[in-house]
């Protein structure tokens, strides 16, 4: 595998423990990979496992850390089916849901800004941008979406949308993806 941002999918015949999987994910993350693992499944359910890993990877991008499926189902996750969550995310993101470079840049900026709890400096450092560029992008997002990101409910709604938006852009330029 090279250093491109091309996602890698792998099937692994594995009976590892939850702790062993966490250690594997942490080691991959330390090497610059962002990974997510599905639950173990029989061969007949590989498509479902791939979808689960892909959704976890979307959430991993939003949080900036690798993810495993929860041992207990998240009650909030059960409220929305995957297709419904994606549709809701697309609606909430409105013009930011586009596939053009401006939309991707604004989503990446918003994701980093929310992950850094609104810190202009940490977001700018993470993105390799000037803090005033981050401020401009966030104000543009607020204007384009008609929201006020000083409102915690709006920040929560944007985090929900970004964590469920099918976007495969790494959160860091050197970060690589791996899902299985």
UniProtKB/Swiss-Prot annotation:
Pfam families, per the entry: HTH_30 (PF13556)
InterPro entries the record matches: CdaR-like_regulators (IPR051448), PucR_C-HTH_dom (IPR025736), PucR_C-HTH_sf (IPR042070)
Annotated family: Belongs to the CdaR family.
Protein name as catalogued: Uncharacterized protein in pkwA 5'region
């Amino acid at each position: 595998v090279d250093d491109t941002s091309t996602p890698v999918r792998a099937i692994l015949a594995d009976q590892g423990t939850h702790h062993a999987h966490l250690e594997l994910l942490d080691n991959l993350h330390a090497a610059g990979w962002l990974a997510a693992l599905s639950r173990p499944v029989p061969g007949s359910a590989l498509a479902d496992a791939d979808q689960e890993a892909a959704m976890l990877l979307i959430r991993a991008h939003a949080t900036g850390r690798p993810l495993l499926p929860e041992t207990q189902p998240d009650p909030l996750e059960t409220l929305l089916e995957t297709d419904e969550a994606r549709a809701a995310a697309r609606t909430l993101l409105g013009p930011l849901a586009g596939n053009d470079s401006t939309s991707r840049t604004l989503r990446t900026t918003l994701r980093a800004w929310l992950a850094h709890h609104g810190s202009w400096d940490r977001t700018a450092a993470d993105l390799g941008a000037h803090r005033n560029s981050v401020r401009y992008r966030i104000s543009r997002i607020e204007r384009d979406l008609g929201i006020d990101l000083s409102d915690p409910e709006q920040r929560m709604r944007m985090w929900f949308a970004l964590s469920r938006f099918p976007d495969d852009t790494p959160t860091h330029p050197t970060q690589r993806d791996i899902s299985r």
